[in-house]
């Protein structure tokens, strides 16, 4: 599958594998006719979804820990959240406030051999949560969602060392398709 977007934004670090697997998962569970509210500002993956025929609206960069009005006021049939919930102090509130009946969400998994990601220059580019699968599943269950499909994958790097070897076979991303109970 060819991804038709500007990869220069990633300065040589474009997440080809993650975008390909996310796109395939979305296509398997969400018909193109369903409208989507994508949590987070417009980004290269928004463009991938639009080029596949999805009608996508993004949130506007508001702090979803404090202001969930975009979620509450949306009439979208599906909410997507690709690597969003790890940035929130309380993803519970957002998940509870979603009115849509379908959710596709992915999160980075906690790696036992690496600390949680934290940008030193961008306060919003930090992971408060890096989930274990059971934690994310429980969060979804507690907020009224039933997981219908799930998938995990690795994120190998081209670096040399012990941790890069572990990344070859340790799952890094977890994606789910869920429906409201």
Residue ranges of predicted features:
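Flexible loop residues that form catalytic
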Residues: 84, 108, 153-155
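Short N-terminal helix/helix-N-cap motif within the alpha/beta-hydrolase-1
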Residues: 89-93, 115
